[in-house]
Amino acid sequence: MSAFIGSWKLCESQNFDEFLRELGVNFFIRKAASTSKPTITFDKFGDNGLKMKTETILKTTEQSFTFGEEFDETTIDGRQVKSTVTRDSDTQLTQVQKHDDGNTVIVRKIEGDMMVTTATFKNITSVRKYQRH
């Protein structure tokens, strides 16, 4: 878990606009999100969780969660979802967001000084890479 603690700045993004389109995100938010370079900061939360802060040009969001426990989340584009984050290993987290249209699965994996985030909804997958900041 400590591998995630700190700040991460987006440095590479693949298929993100298509992923957001599949989720039903409107054109203007998609365009702003696709050009944004968000920073994600992780801090420890309790004995078995994390606090995740995402800062973009659109807005800043924060979620605190305990691994394995469902929580209410407002996504960066304003959707209300039920999320659960599990710790697969010290260097990998899997988040499942449940919403009206199905489930989005987000896997975050630490690879050296990079965090690779793979998000999948239906048949569309986006990969975003973040550099430790």
UniProtKB/Swiss-Prot annotation:
Question: Which cysteines link up through disulfide bonds?
Answer: none
Is Chaperone one of the keywords UniProt gives this record? no
Q: Give the family from UniProt.
A: Belongs to the calycin superfamily. Fatty-acid binding protein (FABP) family.
Keywords in UniProt for this one?
A: Lipid-binding, Transport
Identify this protein by name.
Fatty acid-binding protein
Database matches in SUPFAM superfamilies:
Lipocalins
Lineage, top-rank taxon, reads Eukaryota
Q: Name one GO molecular function term.
A: lipid binding
Question: Which InterPro entries does its entry note?
Answer: Calycin, Fatty_acid-bd, ILBP, Lipocln_cytosolic_FA-bd_dom
